[in-house]
Design a protein with these regions (language model features):
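Basic, Lys/Arg-enriched alpha-helical interface segments
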Residues: 1-73, 81-100
Length: 100
């Protein structure tokens, strides 16, 4: 069964600012999320679940991975909703401006 993956309005605007290569990497990540759910696998660099972030409730499932290493490093952050099998990508951009 596939998951519903959508980008927030903010993430859509951020995606438009990415280079062509980064847009393709984001596309590959979204495809992995659709088919594998919130855990796209260890092949994604620095993939981790967030715990204890400001504003995060105990049952919130927030995750991230790096899209491109180097300077600047680009990351993608998403929320997983297991009960409805939905994933919301809420940030795509540089590590320096990431909401964590």
């Amino acid at each position: 069964m596939t998951w519903d993956v959508f980008l927030s309005t903010k993430a859509l605007k951020q995606k438009d600012k990415l280079s062509k290569d980064l847009k393709f990497v984001l596309f590959l990540l979204v495809e992995d999320l659709k088919h594998k759910g919130g855990n796209p696998g260890n092949q994604w660099p620095n993939y981790k679940k967030f715990k204890g972030l400001k504003g995060q409730r105990k049952n919130d499932d927030w995750r991230h991975c790096h899209l491109q290493k180097g300077n600047p490093t680009y990351v993608c952050c998403w929320k997983v909703f297991e009960d409805t099998q939905r994933i919301e990508v809420y940030y795509v951009g540089t590590h320096e401006n990431a909401p964590y």
